[in-house]
Every structure is written in C-alpha cells, then in structure tokens.
Amino acid sequence: MAEGETLVAKGETPVAVLPGAAPADVGMCPQRTERLLSVLRSEVARQRLPGAVAVIARHGRLALCEAVGALDPAAGTPMTPDAIFRIYSMTKPVVSVAALMLMEQGELLLSDPVARYLPEYGKQEVAHMVDGAVQLQRVRQPATVQDLLRHTAGLTYEFMGSSPVQRQYAQARISSLERSNAAFSQELSALPLMFEPSTHWEYSRATDVLGRVIEVLSGQTLGEFLHSRIFVPLGMRETGFFVPPDKHARIAEPFARDPDGGVQMRVIDVRQPVALESGGGGLTSTAMDYARFLQFMLNRGELGGVRLLGSRMVDFMTADHLEDIPVFSPASRALLSPGHGFGLGVAVRRALGMASMPGSPGSYHWGGRAGTTFFVDPAEDLFAILMLQAPNQREHYRLLFRNLVYAALDD
C-alpha cells in the first residue's frame, strides 16, 4: 500500500479511515517488510498456500495491505485485498465486545449465572468417570457469564477429542447450522459438562451460548445486534454471517485438496443465510474490515470519534482471566502456547519468554479454523492480520507470519 492511501475498500464511503504510510515511517524496515511478502509468494509458488492478504498497521497507520496468490485456486482468479474470508473463531472477540457493551449498559454482570438469562442452563450436570463408567452429577457451582467469555464454563468442542461428552456433542449434531441460536442453546444445555465450571480452561462452544445471551438481552438476532451496534459504527460494511450474491465473486477458497495429505478441504458454505448465527465462528469478513475492528481495540474502544467501549473495559477484556486455572485437555493446551493466558475472548501474552513466537507482554491474539489470524501488541502500537483459507496449515502460517512481522520492526 502506498503512502497516503487509506483503509477504505473500493466503492466504500470513508468511515473509519486508517491512513497509509511507508514502512520506514512507522519504524519498520522496508526490506524486511518486503521479505514477508516474498516468503508468502514463495509459499504460493510451492503450492503450499492458495493465497493470502497480509495487513500490518503501526502508530495508527497502515504500513502493509497486500494480496498474494489466488482468490480461488480452482478458477485461477487472483487474490485481491477486498477478498472475503470465513474468519471462524475470529468471530469470538467481536461477540465478546458485544457482551461487554451490554455490561457497560448495566444489562448484565459477569458474575451472573448463565441461567439468569438462559433458564435451560439451570439444571446442568457434569460427567464424571467412575470405574470406567460415566456418572452424571449436578453442578456444584453454575457457570457464569465470565465463564462463557473465558471458556471455563465446562463446555467443549466435539472435534477436540473423543471423550464420552464429545461423542454426545457429535451424536446431537451440535455443529449443525440448521437450528436457530435459541434451539442450539436448548440442545447444548441438555448435554453434560466436561468439568465443574470455573475449574479448568477448555476451548469450547461457550461463545455460541454468549451469542444467545446477547439475543435475549437485546431482543435482536445476534446478526442484527452486531450489525447495528458494531459493524455500522466502525464502518465494517463487508462483515456478516453470510455473503450476499453480489459479493460471491470475492469469496476466498481453499485448495480442493490438502497439499500435505491430499484430503478434501471442507469449509462452511457462506453463500446463503443460515439458521445458526454462530457467535463462536460464523462471521465472514475482509482484511480491511477486521483492521478497523483491531484499530478500535488498539485505541482502547474508540475509532474515528466513535466510542463503543470504555478504555478500561478494553484493558479488562485483554487482561489474563485465568491466572492459575489449569488447561483441561491436550487439544486446548495446543491453543495456548507457553507464556500465555486467556482474557475475555482472546489469548493474552503473560511473559516475553517461554512462548515459541515473539511478542510483548500484554499483547493478545486469536485465529480462525480456516487459517485467518491476528495479533495486537499495545506496547509496539501494532496490529497485524493474515487472511487465508488453508485449514491444515494454519499453525505453520500463524507462527511464520508473526516471526516475519516482528523481524521487520527496526526502531
């Protein structure tokens, strides 16, 4: 992106403008910034990566917004900066912000039991293994709204293991997009918990439940609330739970088959509205739209004169809320690398060392199942986004991208 350009997609009215800058003007080495793109282009040439959009912003200015590779590798169409991606779990920070907005309005407390808003969660049971058999016991302490936000509610994901509870998730087709948020919540509440709430961290469908809480409190669908209260104020015109027909040609696609194992790549169909507006993983967005959201976060709740959250609330959201709460499963442990805790919707860096990737204490990040990823480093006044659709290579590219971004900082 050339100096002086702004973070506004073609055909958009400027709303949340992020001015462009030469990398050197924001403390980045031009040659090392270009090396990042060269590495991504090399991955495309090796047919390891279908295509990607990379964004780096520092000191409120956009130093990089570039597309590489193919938008749709089957069709051979080139990637464009305004490509639309399935962002999966990068939905979670957005929905977490929505819940905290309601908290700031006095609509909820984080200490409130989930059952206060969703009565079906008032009779939950926990699965215990006794002599090789599952026994169900009533929860001693019901899950709270904070448990939903920080993934300590006793819930799980069916694809993260094969425990008896996870098998019940699969048998109930809990991942189906064909039921409403209300019906999903009812179905999930009837399934046993993996552990007592507040005792462990397990990545889970908790943010899907949080989305239903938002619906009950607001009287709107989750999509309506996010659109009116977050997307419109921040100028995120390309973000939603499905892609309308006039934008289908901009949807980024993965390889038909995984370059590592040859298995067929499956991603959700985002061309039609779905019944379930998944608060944990249903949004589609562009790199530029999500950049607006991250600049809002880096600004501690404000963008372009629009304040959606108080500055202290953003600090609270991005603080570590786990402390000594242990991680429950190996699958969840893989998501929180050493030196990290978890806040209210994002992983949070606790220490400079220990982790396998660079980053300042207090930085935070998350990603999506199809490969999208972001990180925000307040100490460096920096955020970066990598948008791609390469599900099985996502961990490799997240680490590679992070390394290359920090290598380019030279002030």
What annotation goes with each model-predicted range?
Residues V15-A16, R116, K123-P358:
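Short, surface-exposed loop or secondary-structure junction motifs
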Residues E34-R41, G60, F85-Y117, K123, ...:
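Active-site SXXK
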Residues A21-I87, E107-L109, K123-V130, I268, ...:
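Short, conserved catalytic-motif segment at the N-terminal edge
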Residues A9-T33, L344, V348:
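Short, compositionally biased leader-like segments
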